[in-house]
Regions:
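Basic, gly/Ser/Thr/Pro-rich low-complexity segments located predominantly at protein N termini
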Residues: 13-15, 26, 52-55, 85-87, ...
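Catalytic alpha/beta core domains of metabolic enzymes, predominantly
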Residues: 128-129, 142-249
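Short secondary-structure transition/capping segments
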Residues: 55-58, 91, 116-119, 147-149, ...
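Alpha-helix N-capping/helix-start residues
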Residues: 19, 25, 57, 149, ...
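Active-site beta->alpha loop and helix N-cap motifs at the rims of alpha/beta catalytic domains
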Residues: 2-144, 154
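C-terminal alpha-helical cap/extension of soluble enzyme domains
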Residues: 5-16, 34, 38-40, 49, ...
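Glycine-rich phosphate-binding "P-loop"
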Residues: 138-139, 161-162, 272-273
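A general structural signal for well-ordered alpha-helical segments in protein cores
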Residues: 28, 60, 64, 89, ...
Length: 297
C-alpha cells in the first residue's frame, strides 16, 4: 500500500539552475542519483523547494519526466499538484499524464483565504477528480490560512484516496489531535525538518524534507531510528542538525538548502526571482557549521 511506502524520509526536490537561470538538468539528475544512493525513501517533485511557481509548463513537464525515468520505480514519487483555482486543478487531474506518479501532494489554497468549508469543498473536488492517492499539505505560514484538525479529519474520513497530510503548521497540539483521532488508513507526515523527531514520537510516520536534499543519509537514519523507537540515537542526530535547521530558513526556502548544496559543490547557488540567494553572512555561517560537521565544502 502507498501509505506504507510513504513512511520514512521523503525529499522535496530542489530545481538546480545555471548561472543564466536556465534549469540545470544535468545537476537535477545528479541530485536524484545522490538521493537514491543515500537512502531517500521517496521524492516529492515540483513542491515548494522546486521553485515551482517560477517554472514554465514545459520545464515542469521535462522535470517530471526526467525524475520519473531516472527513479524508474525504485522509490515512490509524489507530484505537487496544487493551487488556489480548484477548477484548474481538477482539469489537470483529469487531463494530464500521471504515469509513474505514486501520489499527489496538494497544498491548501493560498491567497484566497478560504473558510474551513471552502477548504473541505476544494479537497472534495480534487478527491473526486482522481483515483490517485492524495497527500494534503497544510502550511499556513505560506498559504495564509490554517486547515484545522477538524477539517483535516473530516476530509480523511470522507475520502478513501486521501491517505496522509504533510503538516507544517508548527502547531504540535493540532498535529497531535490529528494523530490521535485519524482513521487507520491515514497518516501524518512532518512538513518541517526541525520537528520531525518530536512528531514521530507522537505517531507521525516520517517527513517530506528540505534538508534531506543535502544530507539524505544522516537525516534518513534519524528518521528510521525514531520510527524504530530508538529515540536516544535519533535525538543525537537531531541535535547534530539543530543549527542547520535554523540556517535553512533564515533567508527563506530553498535559499538555505541551495547554499548548503553549493557549499558542498553540488549545484550553482542560483534562484529565480523573486527569490534570491542567502546573505553572505548566512552562507558563511552554513560553511562554518558544515566544516564543524566534517562535511566537505
Amino acid at each position: 500500500m502507498i501509505q506504507t511506502k510513504l513512511k520514512g524520509m521523503g525529499v522535496a526536490l530542489i530545481t538546480p539552475f545555471k548561472e543564466d537561470e536556465s534549469v540545470d538538468y544535468d545537476a537535477l539528475i545528479r541530485m536524484v542519483d545522490y538521493l537514491l544512493q543515500h537512502n531517500a525513501d521517496s521524492l516529492c517533485v515540483l513542491g515548494t523547494p522546486a521553485e515551482t511557481p517560477t517554472l514554465t509548463e514545459e520545464e515542469k513537464k521535462t522535470i517530471k519526466k526526467m525524475v520519473i525515468d531516472r527513479v524508474n520505480g525504485r522509490i515512490p514519487i509524489l507530484l505537487g499538484v496544487g493551487g488556489n483555482n480548484t477548477r484548474a486543478i481538477v482539469e489537470t487531474l483529469k487531463n494530464d499524464d500521471f504515469t509513474g506518479v505514486d501520489a499527489i501532494l496538494s497544498v491548501v489554497p493560498y491567497y484566497n483565504k478560504p473558510s474551513q468549508e471552502g477548504i473541505y469543498q476544494h479537497y472534495k473536488a480534487i478527491a473526486e477528480a482522481t483515483e490517485l492517492p492524495i497527500v494534503l499539505y497544510n502550511v499556513p505560514g505560506r498559504t495564509g490560512v490554517n486547515m484545522t484538525a477538524e477539517t483535516t479529519l473530516r476530509i480523511a474520513r470522507d475520502f478513501n484516496n486521501v491517505i496522509a497530510i504533510k503538516e507544517a503548521s508548527g502547531n504540535i497540539t493540532q498535529m497531535d489531535d490529528i494523530i490521535k483521532n485519524k482513521p487507520e488508513n491515514f497518516n501524518v507526515i512532518s512538513g518541517d525538518d526541525g520537528i520531525t523527531f518530536p512528531l514521530i514520537t507522537l505517531g507521525a510516520v516520517g517527513v517530506i524534507s528540505v534538508i534531506g536534499n543535502a544530507f539524505p543519509r544522516e537525516f534518513s537514519r534519524m528518521t528510521r531510528l525514531a520510527l524504530q523507537g530508538d529515540f536516544a540515537n535519533a535525538l543525537t542526530i537531531h541535535h547534530k542538525f539543530t543549527e542547520l535547521f535554523n540556517l535553512l530558513f533564515v533567508d527563506g526556502n530553498p535559499a538555505g538548502v541551495k547554499s548548503m548544496l553549493n557549499a558542498m559543490g553540488m549545484i550553482e547557488n542560483k534562484l529565480r526571482l523573486p527569490l534570491v540567494p542567502t546573505r553572505i553572512t548566512t552562507f558563511e555561517a552554513i560553511r562554518k557549521v558544515l566544516n564543524e560537521l566534517n562535511i566537505k565544502c
